[in-house]
């Protein structure tokens, strides 16, 4: 079993710049980091409901992945991490799909301990832009990277920003609201394809800082993932289950100010040519904060 198989799992099982969390997993956890503290949101009058709209903010996204796989009596573990500096710009007016939106990657800095081949790809990323639409619920759809090859080379940590923004009801959300969504997504990249079906439960409560109102959105979800592809020319299939929790802070004007998400996924990778199955555990954590 080669270390590259770990990266295939990462690319398939991870959502974009969103981690998922769940019960404790056997993978070695990443070193604890300082909890995300949302900065004061910009002054804005409180609205009847919070929803997304035009605006631009620069973010620091810290993403950490810990992956463990077992083959026979051998256990392989790998930790990946990076700090991603990205600017999100939402413009109007919206069309039938959503608001025209770009995510511009200014730079990516690998955490210490990230394997050299991955770190080398990461530092090459400059001015990579994803253009698409932000739908009313917050999904980033119809995304197209400015450099497909470059985007694919860092897909393990970067994803495609589909779930960067917390998912909200289409007509916005008010304090005290609760809602449930079922979301199905398909991700394709290179020789790999995966599908994910998630059930998401969310609640919104009032949040106030420095006299400015906003919302704290708590989410939990369970999901099932399946996929297939080729690793070093050899076919594989995967399936598994995962759980996730997250917290997001939204200003009253709809700006995403901070968030933290954690997930745990247990997968089985089947290698039909070799006739073996490999259990894999992946734990991911993503912290988002606004930069000045």
How would you name each of these model-derived features?
Residues 1-14:
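Sec-dependent bacterial lipoprotein signal peptides
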Residues 16-20:
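Bacterial signal peptide processing site
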Residues 25-292:
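Signature of exported/secreted
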